[in-house]
């Protein structure tokens, strides 16, 4: 049973992620969604006593458990009202968010995708999940879909794939996910951002890349674009804003534009991105 995992908290950010996950499940034939809630220390009230010890207020625990159960019910209803054929399960963990996710992925081998809600510059809800996006995406053994709070789901037809010109012939991971890109009317846009203004790309290299992509993706329309921007993330988002883009796919490892960026710049890029979900392959 193909499964999507959605970490949740008490914010509109993860609620939107749940809505998108259900739509994604419908478009790509997933059958099961697991909602994961972890305990966050900031959610508890503490009774402080002498000698450095502290105890959690029992009333706070009961209140949190009740709130959590209501949250599960609310989010499950959001999914099932629109897609009653989907199976919805809940999971609760007392470990950190990243560890909880990795543990449940190991326990549930049917999980193929993690959907993460992300605060953005248009809407910020102080989501716990959003604060941990980078660590989750980097340590997750399965692909992750980052969903901006402001994003409203639309059918995926125009897919942008930023890539390194020197690693573009290593796109095997993308070819392993053809179920995403083989849909009817899908168009692929490969984008190389160079950060040096005087950098030129040899014509033979362009031809080689073109032939390689067409060899492996003969049935899928695709175009390769070359652009200059000192800031890679800015270059990608600028391109996406001026060219109809429904999804950005980040390639794994050193062939990904993420590989060259610090955590801060990735976080800033995700924060600036309010229009497109980002799928990070593994």
Q: Where do the language-model regions lie?
A:
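Small/aliphatic-rich secondary-structure junction motif
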Residues: 1-56, 158-225, 245, 273
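A short acidic, glycine-rich active-site loop
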Residues: 55-70
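Short secondary-structure boundary segments
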Residues: 118, 192, 251-253, 282
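Residue-level recognition of beta-strand->loop/alpha-helix junctions
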Residues: 37, 92, 148, 192, ...
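Structural beta-alpha unit
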Residues: 23, 40, 77-114, 217-248, ...
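Intrinsically disordered or low-complexity boundary/linker segments at protein termini
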Residues: 1-16, 107, 112-173, 272-282
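Charged helix-capping and loop-helix junction motifs
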Residues: 128-132, 204-209, 262-267
């Amino acid at each position: 049973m193909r499964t999507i995992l959605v970490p949740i908290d008490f914010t509109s950010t993860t609620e939107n992620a749940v809505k998108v996950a259900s739509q994604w499940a419908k478009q790509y034939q997933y059958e099961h969604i697991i909602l994961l809630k972890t305990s966050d220390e900031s959610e508890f009230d503490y009774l402080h006593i002498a000698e450095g010890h502290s105890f959690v207020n029992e009333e706070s625990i009961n209140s949190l458990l009740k709130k959590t159960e209501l949250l599960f019910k609310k989010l499950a209803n959001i999914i099932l009202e629109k897609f009653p054929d989907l199976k919805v399960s809940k999971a609760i963990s007392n470990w950190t968010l990243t560890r909880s996710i990795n543990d449940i992925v190991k326990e549930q081998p049917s999980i193929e995708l993690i959907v993460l809600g992300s605060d953005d510059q248009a809407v910020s809800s102080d989501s716990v999940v959003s604060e941990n996006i980078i660590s989750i995406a980097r340590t997750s053994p399965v692909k992750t879909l980052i969903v901006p709070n402001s994003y409203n789901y639309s059918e995926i037809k125009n897919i942008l794939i930023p890539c390194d010109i020197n690693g573009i012939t290593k796109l095997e991971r993308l070819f392993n996910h053809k179920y995403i890109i083989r849909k009817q009317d899908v168009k692929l846009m490969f984008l190389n951002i160079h950060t040096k203004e005087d950098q030129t790309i040899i014509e033979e290299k362009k031809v080689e890349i073109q032939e390689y992509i067409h060899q492996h993706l003969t049935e899928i329309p695709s175009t390769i674009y070359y652009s200059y921007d000192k800031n890679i993330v800015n270059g990608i988002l600028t391109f996406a804003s001026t060219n109809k883009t429904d999804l950005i796919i980040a390639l794994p490892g050193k062939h990904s534009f993420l590989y060259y960026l610090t955590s801060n710049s990735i976080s800033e890029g995700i924060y600036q991105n309010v229009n497109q979900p980002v799928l990070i392959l593994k």
